[in-house]
Amino acid sequence: MKKSAPGIACLLALPFLLSGCGAVGSKSLSLSVIYAVSSLLAVGILVGYACFSKKLKSWLLMLLVCVTVVNTGYFMLSVSGSLEVALWSNRISYLGSVFLPFTMLMSIMDVCKIKRPKWMIPVLLGVGAIVFLIAASPGILDIYYKEVTLRIVDGVCVLQKVYGPLHSIYLYYLVAYFSCMVAVIMYARHKAHSVSISYAVLLLIATLINIAVWLLEQLVDIEFEFLSVSYIISELFLLGVDILARSLQNQ
């Protein structure tokens, strides 16, 4: 435990350093640089976990993959230069965003030691695919965005959007997943499973924070995707908690 303590402390401290970077929005530092750093960090965390973790957790690994895809999309959008490339970049970011809550729910179910029915994963993946196709429709259909144009703000490409009739479906999708996570944790407590409820709750809190950040971006006109930083913070936090939990188990 003593040997791993410095590494745990560093890992848990990194989110606070990153959160300070997330507030940077001045013209002196291009937002594209922040997106690039977030993407590289996501790749580094993914590779580091895949290569150096003694016991890989498949759903946590998939979560890291999703965050890498999201942040790559954000970076590509910021340097896109044309509406067509920007829309494809937006689709890439949504590809990761749509399946991220799925990996969180699966992780919580694993932590709570709740068996999944065979139909669950295919059905949830199917629902996620439908939501993704709706979110990826701008430029083809006007159901998610009625109108979308490309603007350049302080040298960074951003999409100017007018929301369509099905834009709210993504919010309902997130709320449904969050409700399922709460239900899983409550069920595990009721059944008194021998599990780390506290770890599951931390996963739930990380999900809630990211949903809150997404809602803030929808309600307030902000030219920076704070989720790119929020996801990295969540990754590092969850990895730190995972390392700490394993260290305590090995005592």
Residues covered by each model-derived region:
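Hydrophobic core of alpha-helical transmembrane segments in multi-pass integral membrane proteins
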Residues: L12-L17, A36-G48, L125-A136, F178-A183, ...
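Individual alpha-helical transmembrane segments in multi-pass integral membrane proteins
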Residues: S26-L40, C51-I140, L171, L227-I232
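Interfacial "cap-and-anchor" motif at the non-cytosolic start of specific transmembrane alpha-helices
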Residues: H193-Q251
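Alpha-helical transmembrane segments
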Residues: P15, S19, G44, F99-F102, ...
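Extracellular-loop-to-transmembrane junctions of the mid-late helices
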Residues: V24-S38, L133-V184, E217, D221-L227
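Alpha-helical transmembrane segments of multi-pass integral membrane proteins
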Residues: Y49-G73, R91, L125, Q160-L219
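Transmembrane helix-loop junctions and nearby membrane-interface residues
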Residues: A50, F75-S82, L105, V111, ...
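N-terminal secretory/membrane targeting signals
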Residues: M1-G20
